[in-house]
Amino acid sequence: MKYVKLIKTIEEIAPLELAPLWDNSGVQIYTGQEEIERVLICLDITEEVIKEAENKKTGMIITHHPLIFDSIKKIDTDQVTGRYVCRLIKAGICVYSAHLTFDNAREGNNFYMAKLLGMENLKTAAKERPGEGSKDPAELPSGMTGQLCRQMTPEEAASHIINALEIPQDGIRMVKGKNTIKKIGLCTGAGGDFLDYTIREGCELFITGDVKLHEAQRAKAEGISLIDAGHYGTEHI
């Protein structure tokens, strides 16, 4: 496929305007190819991913998490990012990151996780919360709310999530709320900022990863169940 057409196809699925200003979704490395014959898709670029891409003569790696996130002041092969960048350029491998663009996409990570859980009446928060003043609209928390097919206890919901996301039994941390669970809020990755929105929406459970102490304490005080299924656990899907 033509390189230009491939980029256009990716951005039709995960438009760049869905990313906040601080995110670094998009082209990260372009090595001059006009044609891309083989693509490798990954969650993170690691030593193992690069080795596989080299062995399979991959023209592009499409990664969820950006290889280059902050601005680069120098490329130093004594550092992981610099070493990876040099190695990829030397191998002629392009890199594209679909990070929050894919999280917020119509059928991206949040949507797919909701479908795995069998949720109905889905509502995307990103579309419901316009920017205020000069604030970038995409800076606002993104995620999704919806309903389970039936009422569940917190324990039943936890078991359902473990099975649906195919994560280990000890792969979650949980704050048990006061009520049975029907309405859920979720945000893949590190989505603690979405907790307030799920509380306002009347959710009985919030699912995300990388939950901080004060977020867990807030959930307990509000009586909402909270499940930390891990950053990887909510995105390896």
Positions of PLM-derived features:
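Active-site catalytic microenvironments in core metabolic enzymes, especially phosphate/sugar-handling
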Residues: M1-I237
